[in-house]
Design a protein with these regions (language model features):
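Alpha-helical scaffolding within the catalytic cores
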Residues: 46-51, 81-85, 113, 173-177, ...
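Active-site neighborhood of phospho(di)ester-bond hydrolases with catalytic His/Asp-centered motifs
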Residues: 30-32, 65-66, 100-102, 128, ...
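Active-site gating/metal-coordination segments in enzymes
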Residues: 61, 77-162
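Catalytic pocket-lining loop regions of alpha/beta-barrel enzymes
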Residues: 122-126, 133-240
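Mobile, glycine- and charge-enriched loop segments
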Residues: 25-41, 98-101
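Conserved, mostly hydrophobic/aromatic
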Residues: 33, 55, 86, 147, ...
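Glycine-rich, proline-tolerant flexible connector loops at the mouths of alpha/beta enzymes
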Residues: 67-78
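Mid-to-C-terminal alpha-helical segments outside catalytic/metal-binding sites
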Residues: 2-21, 27-32, 45, 49-62, ...
């Protein structure tokens, strides 16, 4: 193919996308994976305001947030403090900031009590886990069963990259979540940041036969085609718009993805709204 023909085809493709790109500005957007700052950070208030300001500029209507302890693995006191701050943020930004309950499932009794407090008393919308344990370790099972009872999702840190093994020996990946889903098909698991580094194509393929596992689109890796492959392989109902605080890259990724408007509506907000509605239902 000549360069002229290639360029002509690209222009036609871009022209065809233009209406959809314009339409995305009017679509509701909910970031299903965001973080507010731990209060040990001196400028945490400014950092949180900056996140909201960026969300305003990028037309993100709501952010599902957690606050993580910089000390890991977090103690029970650590995660309770983080969730207290999260509840304060939800009160400061009602309807704009939605809360994940951050816990370390190694504290089995404390985790159960904290999830109950956050979900049933403070109005949080889900649970956030880091890499303290693989998602398939039995220590997680009581928590997973509790989330099934409460009809809430677990947003789980994830990666599939060989270079993470030394610093994160218990990091889960798509295959780990698929295995967990076979044990608990009723659980709602969100595999974090397809664009967070590592082999994202492997991640998408590994989740194909795990229908209860969702994939969020966050991260800073700029590869093209991530969202399209995820929607094509998993179906639009299982892909969730997210930024993980990489807002410009993540918004650009979802707004420029070659999707039908119906699929884009699902990915940008409809799917996470449907997940949250299960709790209210």
């Amino acid at each position: 193919m000549s360069r002229r023909a290639f360029a002509g085809g690209a222009l036609v493709g871009a022209a065809g996308l233009a209406p959809s790109l314009a339409a995305t500005a009017k679509m509701k957007a909910i970031d299903c994976h965001a973080h507010l700052s731990h209060h040990s950070r001196k400028d945490w208030e400014a950092a949180d305001r900056n996140l909201i300001d960026m969300a305003d500029r990028l037309q993100i209507d709501a952010l599902c947030c957690s606050i993580l302890s910089p000390r890991r693995p977090a103690t029970a006191d650590d995660f309770r403090q983080c969730n207290d701050w999260m509840a304060e943020a939800m009160r400061r930004y009602p309807g704009r900031i939605l809360g994940y309950c951050f816990v370390n499932p190694g504290y089995i009794k404390e985790t159960r009590a904290e999830v109950s407090r956050c979900i049933e008393k403070l109005g949080f919308m889900g649970v956030k886990l880091y890499n303290d344990y693989l998602a398939t370790e039995p220590v997680l099972w009581p928590l997973v069963e509790q989330t099934i009872e409460l009809r809430i999702p677990i947003l789980h840190h994830a990666a599939h990259a060989y270079w993470l093994s030394p610093p994160q020996p218990r990091v889960s990946d798509g295959g780990t979540f698929a295995e967990l889903a076979r044990r608990y098909p009723e659980a709602m698991i969100i595999c974090a940041h397809i664009a967070g580094g590592g082999d994202w194509e492997w991640t998408v393929k590994s989740l194909k036969n795990a229908p209860s596992v969702y994939l969020d689109t966050s991260g800073s890796v700029p590869d093209e085609g991530m969202v399209e492959m995820a929607v094509r392989t998993l179906g639009a109902d299982r892909v969730l718009f997210a930024c993980d605080n990489s807002l410009t890259a993540s918004v650009g990724r979802i707004r420029s993805a070659v999707l039908s408007d119906a699929d884009r509506v699902k990915v940008m907000a409809g799917n996470i709204q449907r997940i949250m509605a299960r709790r209210r239902g």
